[in-house]
Amino acid sequence: MSQITLIILILAIGFSCTKSHPINSTRDGEDSGTDLKNLLTEPANTTYATNSTLTRKELNSTIQPERNDEGSAIRKIMASKKDENITGQSEINTSAKSQPINSTRDGEDSGTDLKNLLTEPANTTYATNSTLTRKELNSSIPPERNDEGSAIRKIMASKKDEIITGQSEINTIAKSQPINSTRDGEDSGTDLKNLLTEPANTTYATNSTLTRKELNSSIPPERNDEGSAIRKIMASKKDEIITGQSEINTIAKSQPINSTRDGEDSGTDLKNLLTELANTTYLTNSTLTRKELNSIIQPERNDESSAIRKIMASKKDENVTGQSEINTSAKSQPINSTRDGEDSGTDLKNLLTDPANTTYATNSTLTRKELNSTIQPERNDETSAIRKIMASRKDENVTGQSEFNISTNSNLNTTTHHEDAVVSPTEKVYVPNNASSAELNVSSTIQPKEADATTSSANDIKKPAFPYCIILITFQIVTVGMIIYLVFRTMRKPCQSERAIPLNTFGFGNNSSHE
């Protein structure tokens, strides 16, 4: 009996050692490290350090700008830079290298800086910090609950003779001409500066804090969707024209929202609208739950009037037309996934031009459900939200439908140890994704890597794990062998001395001789 108890105890200890690595995830299956990067091109020696955490309600609040459209808060935004015109409506025009709003407790705006309206040299450093309470944002952002009188009368600003008068929800435009507006809301003189070229060695350090209710109060000025709040966004740079509607026009190299547990965001930074040079390093980390991703890509629950009609863009002879919730192109890491027909290493490469010597260090972890949620923006598919995405580079055309247009010069190459293999774009070398579906989806996920720009490449080489599994299997084989030995020893035939005592009919020894 004691031998059997000892065997059971040994087996229990052995099998308790077979603990698998848990999935590297946050509290509710959030994904850490999702990074959509570098929409077009990027300047040299620029460093970004980002971190974001958004709850589902926070993301829902950022994508619902049009609840009541009886009176649109912003009628037309017309801007010209030489031959450039931008007309349309927008709740939030957040463009490139802007100083966030520094506000006091009573909601008054202190220190708004529309910086470097024409030219900005290299080696420029921005250090900003803003903290707005919900009441402050409520007081500053929804001036037009009753749209009979427009909340934005005049926003006139000039450099040298700069004057800013009027009301504005959030006019966060940096390295650009401030909005000069007339009574009917038409905007004249907006200068979106440096759409092509940006000097190198520019460092940005920003920090902002917004609660979920504050973001909610800043974005939904239009509760009724009878008339869309964004009619036309037309922009031309020489021969370039962009027209269409968009809830969120997030262009190129923006800092994702850094949020704390209560939904406050710190560090929102939209940078570098078009071009950047080489030698750019990004250190990113983000955490989004499946429901949060689902809320990002579903702005059109009621598809009777599509929120995004046309997005037409031309760069010399290049045209992009169609509808898209998220047009994330150029130098972004594609999602490597397995299991349900998910996309493993898709590389839509080099839509425009990709400079050399660009290094990306990313860590992403997406579950199957999270990936499924990012590619299902249209619950009601009667009218598809994305009709055509046509892009041409000289004679190249790409047509079709896509939720994500992810273009890059490097793949997110995942090894069996779940490390991101950084591939130099100049060498044009791609490492295939060899991780099995069981490794990616069952036992473990891609482990986020502590990215450090100063760490040598030698630190990226993982030492092989100690073969605990081999030791455990050997121990179990020995245990099973010992069990078999004990069983056969118990069941062996009795020896000759034991046969000398005959048994009677009832199984007892015959003791008559002793009597």
Swiss-Prot record:
Top-rank taxon, per record: Viruses
Recorded GO CC terms: host cell membrane; membrane
Cytoplasmic side: 489-515
Record key words, sorted: Glycoprotein, Host membrane, Host-virus interaction, Inhibition of host innate immune response by virus, Membrane, Signal, Transmembrane, Transmembrane helix, Viral immunoevasion
Region (Disordered): 80-114, 314-358, 393-413
Gene for this chain: O9
Extracellular topological intervals: 21-467
Name of the protein described by the UniProt record: Mucin-like protein Glc1.8a
Entry-listed glycosylation sites: 24, 45, 51, 60, 85, 93, 102, 123, 129, 138, 180, 201, 207, 216, 258, 279, 285, 319, 327, 336, 357, 363, 372, 397, 405, 413, 434, 441
Record's bilayer topology term: Single-pass membrane protein
Subcellular location: Host membrane
Function, as annotated: Involved in suppression of the insect cellular immune response. Inhibits host hemocyte adhesion and phagocytosis.
Biased composition (Polar residues): 86-104, 320-338
Source organism of this protein record: Microplitis demolitor bracovirus (isolate Webb) (MdBV)
